[in-house]
């Protein structure tokens, strides 16, 4: 399962909270999301609208998936049983997870517009969904008719078996907008490796010099977050970031182990780690630095999801020793105009790589942005503003011509307008 609570961490929960350095505390807000009436809740996914999903105890003692938005936690119900868990949510508000059905089996579900739909299985009795992209493609795993578990990609009512790396089982945990799926698969009867599946091919991502690895999340750049032992004889796990055949050990918060669960489009990674004092704390990793996200009166915290705004979700132990879903919001210094333009250039490049734009269209857009950077370097703000306006005009033409979707095109226009608001008179 995606929310794998590593034994090495849970066994090491100890006394008081280490807390955050004063400078980081000034920029961090931790919000207790409450419960559905019970004493426990856990948050696993968040979209860029700040909608959060997870599960909570109800007042009657059942476990139900929830959707939290603007201070209100909504019970999503079940597929007929007494348990449901929500794992991920996309920008359309579609939620995926798993639930017991009336006969007791566990099935993957898709919730939207107030209705929970059973996604079925690959022929076996159980299935679970863990990731959904904005196209509505769903990643997870299911029992097959032979009784083994295989990763799947579900779309428009069809559940596709993604196969394995040669072993007996595979598990899918996330899918990005390109339809790339991240997860892990057994390569023989004992060892398992992280994989990246794309267009029918399952690729072994290797390990951190150990014998095992697990991939749990993937962003639009194809960067993968997960964990594995840092060397063959290690009994601990370390969070890792995989990118273009390179797998990087993200280290720890001073303790022995760490696990990475989420990654956003900026390459920010979240998860949890043992600290130097032997406690377990949520972390945010970026630019080769792992930051302790602290706790909220209790002894420990764990993080599982992050959106493109840098908001992190997970759970905390409260001062009253309950476990509650939590939302971390870090107020980061605003990006410079140059940094924002660089991000737009990367956005355009991804559209070319995915085939949405052809090379000529991409080059024309990137040329305008690169020339904007040159004008900014010369402090020629009017020329820079003119180039940004030409960029947005070209994007609008691509929308009008049906080449870019309105959502994708408007996203680029909004990014360019954000720069204009800072530099244009």
Located regions from the model:
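Soluble extracellular-acting proteins and domains
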Residues: 333-425
């Amino acid at each position: 399962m995606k929310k794998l609570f590593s034994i090495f961490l849970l066994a090491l929960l100890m006394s008081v909270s280490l807390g955050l350095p004063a400078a980081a505390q000034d920029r961090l807000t931790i919000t207790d999301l409450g419960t559905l009436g019970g004493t426990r809740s856990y948050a696993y996914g968040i979209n860029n609208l700040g909608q959060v999903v997870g599960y909570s105890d109800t007042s009657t003692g059942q476990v139900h998936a929830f959707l939290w938005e603007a201070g209100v936690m909504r019970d999503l119900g079940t597929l007929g049983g007494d348990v449901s868990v929500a794992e991920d949510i996309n920008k359309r508000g579609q939620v995926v997870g798993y639930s017991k059905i009336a006969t007791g089996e566990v099935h993957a579900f898709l919730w939207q517009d107030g209705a929970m739909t059973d996604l079925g299985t690959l022929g076996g009795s159980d299935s679970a969904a863990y990731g959904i992209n904005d196209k509505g493609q769903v990643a997870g795993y299911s029992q097959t008719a032979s009784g083994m578990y295989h990763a799947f990609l579900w779309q428009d009512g069809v559940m596709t078996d993604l196969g394995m790396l040669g072993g007996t089982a595979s598990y899918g945990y996330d899918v990005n907008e390109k339809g790339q799926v991240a997860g892990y698969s057994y390569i023989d009867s004992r060892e398992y490796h992280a994989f990246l599946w794309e267009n029918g091919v399952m690729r072994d991502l290797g390990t951190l010099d150990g014998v095992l690895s697990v991939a749990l999340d993937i962003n639009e750049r194809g960067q993968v977050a997960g964990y594995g032992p840092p060397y063959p004889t290690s009994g601990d796990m370390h969070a890792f970031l995989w990118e273009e055949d390179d797998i990087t050990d993200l280290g720890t918060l001073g303790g022995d182990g760490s696990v990475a669960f989420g990654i956003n489009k900026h390459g920010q990674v979240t998860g949890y780690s043992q600290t130097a004092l032997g406690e377990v704390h949520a972390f945010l990793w970026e630019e080769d630095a792992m930051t302790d996200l602290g706790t909220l009166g209790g002894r420990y915290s764990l993080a599982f999801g992050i959106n493109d705004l840098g908001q992190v979700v997970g759970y905390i132990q409260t001062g009253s020793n309950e476990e509650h879903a939590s939302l971390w919001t870090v107020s980061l210094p605003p990006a410079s105009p140059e940094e924002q333009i660089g991000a737009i250039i990367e956005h355009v490049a991804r559209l070319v790589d995915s085939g949405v734009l052809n090379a000529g269209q991409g080059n024309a857009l990137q040329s305008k942005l690169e020339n904007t950077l040159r004008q900014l370097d010369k402090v020629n703000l009017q020329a820079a503003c003119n180039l940004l306006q030409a960029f947005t005009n070209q994007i609008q033409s691509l929308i009008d011509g049906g080449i870019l979707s309105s959502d994708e095109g408007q996203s680029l226009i909004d990014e360019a307008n954000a720069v204009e608001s800072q530099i244009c008179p």
